[in-house]
């Protein structure tokens, strides 16, 4: 079983491919999940749900982020923008993920990507 940061990192890479590289979501998800067949089915399902849910609610999530951030979503670095989007999705729509875990893993992922507070 992979750790939460690894799973969210895979989801982040998929989100970046879709939002930055303009890859079709179903193709990006399928290609990424094919590369991680070694992960348990439950972990791959988590990645899929996180990506699809973040994309489905992206407009709503961006609206929320704009209400609370001093930096507009469209001005954020793509990595940070997508970490925040997936974090907010987990907080709002994934009841199986504790709020503390969603926040902690978002911070860990940002640090792993080279962003420090």
Show which residues each predicted segment covers.
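Class I Rossmann-like S-adenosyl-L-methionine
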Residues: 1-117
